[in-house]
From Swiss-Prot:
This is Ribonuclease T. Mg(2+) 1 binds at D23. The active site is at H181 (proton donor/acceptor). InterPro entries: Exonuclease_RNaseT/DNA_pol3, RNase_T, RNaseH-like_sf, RNaseH_sf. Its EC number is 3.1.13.-. GO terms for biological process: DNA replication proofreading; tRNA processing.
Length: 223
């Protein structure tokens, strides 16, 4: 099979987009005012059989930006103490420079033309990521400015449940609720869920699509 029509290559699976799984932990719901406190980024790879899997994960604790709002309820929910020196937190800019470097390298290796964020309830994560990039005045973001793959939506379609923990368990992916709301843990479970859905769709015959010409030929033969 030629590279041009090789459906088992990642660059052909999502129209040239390289999926990057992201989860953030924050000090509230407002991306403009509330601090980004933790981020994890999981890179994916596709094997020779066209099956998607986890490659590696980057993880950063983030220092609240100057003047950031810290909602007590949000901190109680995720258990993060922004002032704990043991967090080893770095600035938003330092984290995103490292993230940009890693995802651009992976995107190039996969011969894709742009990265697209995969997240559970993706609008939330995409909003905080985009705002942090804007605050840091970073240019040439690898991420699509508005398009995302939302695993809550995909799981609702493929599995019948939208809650991450429940969807994972229904897909046979172990999920420990005690570990939840850690960006590192949630990102890797989200990545496993996304890979499960993509791979299951392939196994069921949904991918690759038959070319229009092949479909027409089959129709002519049947007639």
């Amino acid at each position: 099979m030629s590279d041009i029509c090789d459906a088992n290559k990642l660059k052909h699976r999502f129209r040239g987009y390289f999926p990057v799984v992201i989860d953030v932990e924050t000090a509230g719901f407002n991306s403009q005012t509330d601090a980004l406190l933790e981020i994890a980024v999981t890179l994916l790879k596709m094997d020779d059989e066209g099956m998607l899997g986890i490659d590696k994960t980057l993880h950063f604790h983030i220092e609240p930006f100057e003047g950031a709002n810290l909602e007590p309820a949000a901190l109680a929910f995720n258990g993060i103490d922004p002032n704990n020196p043991l967090r080893g937190a770095v600035s938003e800019k330092e984290a995103f420079l490292d993230i940009f470097k890693a995802v651009k390298k992976a995107q190039k290796a996969a011969d894709c033309h742009r990265c697209i964020i995969v997240a559970h309830n993706a609008a939330f994560d995409h909003g905080f990521v985009s705002k942090a990039i804007e605050r840091c005045d970073l240019k040439r973001s690898p991420f699509h400015p508005f398009a995302t793959f939302d695993t809550a939506t995909l799981a609702g379609l493929a599995i019948g449940h939208t809650v991450l923990a429940k969807a994972c368990m229904m897909a046979g992916i172990p999920f420990d609720n005690k570990e939840a709301h850690s960006a590192l843990y949630d990102t890797e479970r989200t990545a496993e869920l996304f890979c499960y859905i993509v791979n299951r769709w392939k196994q069921l015959g949904g991918w690759p699509l038959l070319a229009a010409g092949a479909q027409d030929a089959e129709s002519d033969t049947e007639e």
